[in-house]
């Protein structure tokens, strides 16, 4: 399987308390089916961070990978923007 076919997401790190694991919140805009209002939906992904490089509030890019644990199916690709 080529890596280019894997899903990628960009989000903010909301937790890095675990060893080699970060929690990334990804926001998507969704239109309400009945009323048409555009809402923000937040989904949290647990991602593998081998070098513990990401900190809270960093903007990061994650990529889909094989299952690494019960809940981890994503890995950190790069830190796009460091927190201020």
From Swiss-Prot:
Keyword Isomerase: no
One GO term of the biological process aspect: translation
InterPro entries: NA-bd_OB-fold, Ribosomal_uS17, Ribosomal_uS17_bact/chlr
Gene Ontology cellular component annotations, sorted alphabetically: cytosolic small ribosomal subunit
Keyword line: Ribonucleoprotein, Ribosomal protein, RNA-binding, rRNA-binding
Molecular function GO labels: rRNA binding; structural constituent of ribosome
SUBUNIT field: Part of the 30S ribosomal subunit.
Protein family according to the UniProt entry: Belongs to the universal ribosomal protein uS17 family.
Listed PANTHER family: 40S RIBOSOMAL PROTEIN S11 FAMILY MEMBER, SMALL RIBOSOMAL SUBUNIT PROTEIN US17M
Role played: One of the primary rRNA binding proteins, it binds specifically to the 5'-end of 16S ribosomal RNA.
Name by which UniProt lists this protein: Small ribosomal subunit protein uS17
Organism: Clostridium botulinum (strain Okra / Type B1)
Lineage, highest ranks first: Bacteria, Bacillati, Bacillota, Clostridia, Eubacteriales
Gene: rpsQ
């Amino acid at each position: 399987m080529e890596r280019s076919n894997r899903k990628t997401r960009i989000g903010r790190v909301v937790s890095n308390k675990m060893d080699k694991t970060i929690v990334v919140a990804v926001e998507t805009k969704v239109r309400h089916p009945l009323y048409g209002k555009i809402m923000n939906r937040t989904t949290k992904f647990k991602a593998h961070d081998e070098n513990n490089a990401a900190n809270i509030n960093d903007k990061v890019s994650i990529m889909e990978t094989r299952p690494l644990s019960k809940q981890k199916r994503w890995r950190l690709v790069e830190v796009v923007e460091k927190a201020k």
